[in-house]
Amino acid sequence: MLDLKYITENIDEVILKLNTRGGDFSHLRQLIDLQEERKSVIKEVEDLKAKRNEYSKEIGELKRQKQDASHVLLKVESIKSDIPALELKLGEIDEKINKELIVLPNIPADDVPVGKDESANIEIKKWGTIRHFDFEVKDHTQLGEALNILDFERATKITGPRFVVDKGLGARLERALINFMIDTHAYTHGYTEIIPPFIVNDKSMYATGQFPKFKEDAFKLEGFDWYLNPTAEVPTINLFRDEIIDNDALPIQYVAYTTAFRSEAGSAGRDTKGILRQHQFNKVELIKFARPEDSEQAHQDMLANSERILQLLNIPYRVVVLSTGDMGFGMSKTYDIEVWLPGQNMYREIGSISNARDFQARRANIRFKRSKDAKTEYVHTLNGSGLAVGRTMIAVLENYQNQDGSITIPEVLKPYMGVEVIK
């Protein structure tokens, strides 16, 4: 959520920057009028309460002097009836303001490229050497089905499209990737490992910015105010909702493994084949809570941590900065890591690393104090894929395939797999 004071004091700049995300935000000028009306009503309430206190003192004095105070009592009663009406009006104004603020996306950072969609994204780095095959390359679906490690037909029978059954060494490979990612982030990069709930409530979804915009993408549990977790970002950010963090505890960084669930309501017809875009998928997520002055460095560190997974797997990738029109709703700046997939002969997203600054912290009311007597401030929150497990599995299968259809296990995964080849 954006700061109302900042919006009203910098309205032209805010509208200009939000417009780069797509759409017209000129209607935000009405927030200035609403804010002024709010201040006026608050002053009116405060003035009436001050008068009520004065009259109460006057009544006390009159009674001590054994004089008639009925005329002053009438004034107090009049004020008592006026204040609730004004407080009701104030509540209505606050509701109007909150309805505007809750649907506003985050303001893009100054160095984010301006553009309407992914075509304006800017590549800033490439890593690794793309392998040149001397045989016809297969995609992960062909490889997985031929090796009997991915079963799409039975998954569709069990549930429906966009699901898969991992079998045998396929299941072991997915588990190996999860453990390898968590071990690397926990032991090498210093993140604290957590396994949060896979079910979250309505407040948690609003706090991180999933709601209201992406409500159609969520799976709701009928009869409950609960939703299946769309990303570990949601439960992990909400660990500190409505809390004040000790300054000495910052920065806080977690690595969280969850299964994620998404309806993919806006993705009809896209990536329907294979495990690239599914309703249920495993994901290792990185989360940081940082002081405002430290969040940019925290963002760079998180990006490097996520990149390290692919470097250790020795799989080519590139990093792009997302444009204003391609960024997520609650993010101020996002890097995408795109892995090379020989089966598609292109780079595909395998993880996003984002800085939300104080946007989520305001929605979730997550604050910190620099000292005992200091005023509270909002923390900055950051999140990143570390990585999407299914897409990493695709990258391993396609980049490490052999002419006979077998898959060579990357060196770093051999201790987890117990075999050197899937065949």
Swiss-Prot record:
Chain sites annotated for binding L-serine: 231-233, 285, 385
GO cellular component terms given for this protein: cytoplasm
Subcellular location field: Cytoplasm
InterPro entries xrefs: aa-tRNA-synt_IIb, aa-tRNA-synth_II, aa-tRNA-synth_II/BPL/LPL, Ser-tRNA-ligase_type_1, Ser-tRNA-synth_1_N, SerRS_1_N_sf, SerRS_core, tRNA-bd_arm
Coiled coil: none
Cross-referenced PROSITE patterns: AA_TRNA_LIGASE_II
Membrane-spanning residues: none
Keywords, comma-separated and alphabetical: Aminoacyl-tRNA synthetase, ATP-binding, Cytoplasm, Ligase, Nucleotide-binding, Protein biosynthesis
Pathway recorded for this protein: Aminoacyl-tRNA biosynthesis; selenocysteinyl-tRNA(Sec) biosynthesis; L-seryl-tRNA(Sec) from L-serine and tRNA(Sec): step 1/1
Annotated binding of ATP, by residue: 262-264, 349-352
Enzyme Commission code: 6.1.1.11
One Gene Ontology term of the molecular function aspect: serine-tRNA ligase activity
UniProt comment concerning the protein's domains: Consists of two distinct domains, a catalytic core and a N-terminal extension that is involved in tRNA binding.
Job description of the protein: Catalyzes the attachment of serine to tRNA(Ser). Is also able to aminoacylate tRNA(Sec) with serine, to form the misacylated tRNA L-seryl-tRNA(Sec), which will be further converted into selenocysteinyl-tRNA(Sec).
Assembly description: Homodimer. The tRNA molecule binds across the dimer.
Protein name: Serine--tRNA ligase
Species this protein is from: Acholeplasma laidlawii (strain PG-8A)
Gene: serS
